[in-house]
Amino acid sequence: MIRKLTLALLMSGTALTAQAPALAQTPAPVSKLVDAVNIPHEKFTLDNGLTVLVHEDRKAPIVAVSIWYGVGSKNEPKGKTGYAHLFEHIMFNGSENAPGDYFEYTKKIGATDLNGTTWLDRTNYFQTVPTTALESALFLESDRMGYLLNAVSKEKLDNQIGVVSNEKRQGDNQPFGLVSYTQSGTLFPVGHPYHHSTIGSLEDLSAASLDDMKNWFIDHYGPNNAILVLAGDINAAQAKPLVEKWFGKIKRGKDVAPVNAPVPTLEKDIKIVMKDKVPTTRIYRNWVVPGLADPDTNSLFVGLSALGGLSSSRLDNILVRQEQTAVGASAYLIPFVHGSLVNIQVDVKPGADADAVAKRLDQILADYIKTGPTAEEVQRVATSNIAAQIDGLEQVGGFGGKAVALAEGQLYVGDSDFYKKELQRLAAAKPTAVKAAMQKWLTRPVLEIRVEPGEREVYKEVAAGAGSRTGTLSSPAFYAPPGSEDNLVSSPLSFQDRSTFPEPTGTPALDFPTVEETTLSNGIKVFFARRAAVPTVRVAVSFNAGYAADPADKRGIASMMSTMMSEGTTSLTSTQIAETEEKLGADVSVGSSLDRTVASLRAVKPNLGLSLDLLADVIKNPAFATNELERVRVQQLTRIKSENNQPQGIAVRRLPPLLYGKGHPYGGPQTGSGYAETVAAIGRDDVVNFHTSWVHPAKAEIFVVGDTSLKEIKPMLEVRFGKWTSNAAPAPAKNFAVAVPAPESRILLIDRPNSPQSLVLAGLVLDAKGSDDLLTLRAANEIFGGDFLSRINMDLRETKGWSYGVRSQINGAEDRVPFYMFAPVQTNQTGPSVKVLIDQLKDFNGVKPVTAAELEKTIKGNVLKLPGNYEQSSAVLGQMQSDRLNKRPFNYAETLAGKYNGLTAAALNDAMRVKVDPSKITWLIVGDAAKVKPQLEALGLPIEMVTEAANTSASNSA
């Protein structure tokens, strides 16, 4: 559906509009690609009104269980904003016959890709489970649909009000975090169901009562207002009796009256200027246009994609690449039922005249609306998006799989085949229709928002930690209360025994694909695994580089080089690269992580050869043009400023260098962006030399997963990489012998006045390498802090309500690995939260070791979820690369069940106790020092004040 494709476009790159040279071969036609997108399914409806969609996909022993309710924030009346989302949280706190946390059950049945989300038009809940646990999942979903009311308590409600309030604060605390409130509150008039944000008002949330929540459930959570999708190792004949068994006896609920709301138009242009802690000025242009079912929406989607969504978009070409007055530009459409949001935004280059950029943006937009896109632009939009949809068909559930496509169509327009019709519309789009739609809808009055660097207004909070950012909103004029029938959805029509939880009936074995190996004539090793569920192929050419290869005085060079490799080759401009990708429906990218630099390709099978040509050109022949280098430098410097303007960015930049020391390969910011002064000093010769010595055939390995064979792919790789040689010697091995500083327990406090939350990041470099067997240690950490059900998350989030989410993790690395704890917490509980983390770690290593129940849950959950973990070819590709990095055999995934089953509580306790010493943890806290420091002083640890701006290579020496 367009909705899914639009969200994918939010992450797309940018490039120039020069005409690419003709391809040696003709790419597959768009119509052929559309034919490959197919989700056959059966539909049936229970007597109580529950609509059920079943799609059969036997590639793995898993089933996606996804349930969508026709209720969202649009259904919230006056004084109850945020209730739809708050109730989504309540749904995870246990039902009458499944008491306790919902995730307690999903963990022990091996669920993957699980969550719940709320948006304007819907609330959904989803999980992918082993086939043997399907009945378990149906029991859980049906129990919270039909048997929730008696399990909802004031204590649970109060806790989730705290959790959601901290979720809101966490979002508001990000750069540009307040813009969406201004957009919805201005574009949609008072009384429109989209006038307020989904997260709602803290004032309204704090006033929520137990009766409010129970009535919300009664009014909206009947089976007749829901769609259940089962996709995977199941068919309708198997599904019907199970669905009837668990859902059939739930009584029909109240009918939810449809919401009817016209598309609003502003009376006149509105200009708003906001201040925020942002690296540069951002300019917005916003309109409301028709909802997702309107034919004009498809045309607008195409037009906006060509304007600012494609890698070759016009905005990026003109403002970012040619005129270089901006460091980023995008345009996209987010579709909803009662109106869609058009968002066009430009990030002004630091030092450029924002007024001039805004004027130029409006000129470009006016010209584009007048002339429309070219036929080739329309074709590239269609090809690239349909190819992405094909790739998405590999996943049955999750946030964007086949279950989502079916459910959205059925819920929003009453047609589960809507995804196919949308793609057919996309393939048939014409420039004339696109131009007409833009002239009709984008010439109306516009909302112009400008966010400038500066201090945002003081974040106000009132008693009991509640406050209001969106204000108390009027009742939507188009809100229609549910029918007045006196029935409760919690009352069953007849008895169904729910006294015993249906445990999984077995443990499906993981069938990890066989990895074949070969070697090209120049010595490059190739590793191949076949996955043919969809006609796509993924290729990763991995180099032993990464930002651990950055010299200490050139931190950021690996990231700069990676970006530059896609910005033009000796035969193609950056625009021509982007346009070629779009014509082929391919995705070519280069990126660096800590230990590796990887050039990746996702290709549709019919265009594999042409796509490999492009990948090879990007790897072997980058031009590193000086003008492109200067533009990329400004973008990277702006990225550094952006990282320094958000709490998490500050923390992950500052703490790792202190832990490892500035001379260690891991002693730079873990974002890989480097420091402003090192990036400013990197010259073209530096980048060329780095590429010559690190992107070298002697440091390369090729990984391939997809719908091909080693016999077919090897000759294709041999032609493109087998004769590749270099006159230069490869770079020497990274110097991991550099000593890591002795760990020191202290608190580093970075002051951010008026911050609504504090960000706590704690760390320790462990005496362990990534190639060591860390499974036992990671299993112990899963219980301590690595999982939603972990001790620290359940304490700080589910018991105390001080945080939206807390985690600890043991990162992967080629050399010594770090242990981190991450906790965004409300300001007035910062000190107590740190004490909780310290005490929990001490207790874990001492008086409260791993329990038998925790061990069983960890073993069972990890074993059962193995088939779901490797459903997608991208996961197989990632596992292959991880195995190679960590010197493991390629059948490692298939040995995991045995390894987990062999774990003992004593082994987990010993692993954590030996490796993670609470007295050696370094703490970095970003927050309002005036409010936070007195709390921290009570902990008795040394406190060092660190200036927020002092984030240079010199300031991060150990």
Language model segments and positions:
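Gram-negative bacterial Sec-dependent N-terminal signal peptides
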Residues: M1-A22
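Proteolytic maturation boundary segments
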Residues: L23-L53, N235-K275, N286, N317, ...
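M16 family metallopeptidases and their MPP-like homologs
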Residues: H55, A60-K78, G82-L86, G100-Y147, ...
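Short, conserved secondary-structure transition motifs
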Residues: V163-G171, P262-D276, A382-L393, A603-V604, ...
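Short, conserved charged micro-motifs
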Residues: L134-S136, A236-K240, P295, A352-A356, ...
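A common structural junction motif
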Residues: S142-V152, F247-K254, Q363-P373, V618-F624, ...
